[in-house]
Amino acid sequence: MVLEIRNISKNFGGISALTDVSFTINEGEIFGLIGPNGAGKTTMFNIITNMYAPTAGDIIFNGETITGTPPHKINQKGICRTFQNIKLFQQMTVLENVMVGRHSRSSAGVFRSVLRVPSQKREEEEMMMKAKELLSLVGLDSHIHMVAENLSYGQQRRLEIARALASDPKLLLLDEPAAGMNEKETDSLYDLIKEVQKRGITVLIIEHDMPLVMKLCDRITVLNFGKKLAEGTPEEIQNNDSVIEAYLGTEEEDVFA
């Protein structure tokens, strides 16, 4: 077991965003976290990465309680994420964006590397090789010198994944990675996430594209109004009446097709 979410609750004033939510993720899984808008999915990501402190409950990663651990140390322990809203360095090149992500695994600080301290030259070269490898993985190897803001939306999504992978995560959190993608880009994203899984990285994904989720995930937890509604395999979730009802009463074929 890589991650255990244990009885997590989160209140914002008098509003309960999450209430006593628990689930576990096994090593090597692609695990889906789904639910209608406002269900508490991104709040859960923010708690896992300690951008928010939980009101109650604990986060256990590889057997260690990490509740309250500073976000940069959570990253160093092997958890990295992407965001709903793309957070790239838009004026930096594609390669530079991934290099920044790689620095969390470097003994050299960003500023020492910028100053080109001689003792760090070899490490900097190794980091660049790793960054180029990841850009090849996500299909951006021909765009390494392009400024990030000039990439298409789908390409920026892939760059954000490459930057997250640069820190060598054991657990990768993807927050709506298919948002804004066309069908071809979504198919390519599926292949990319499957390749990430083959590399031994566990994936926790929030996604509203139900066909992608059902094809991609090994198991799924469904949240609704901050509470755990259901958990199971894609087949079990597709046949769960409570899940269908949670999606505003939409017919099953419309939700999952």
Q: For each predicted feature, which ranges?
A:
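Glycine-rich phosphate-binding loops of nucleotide-dependent enzymes
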Residues: 2-257
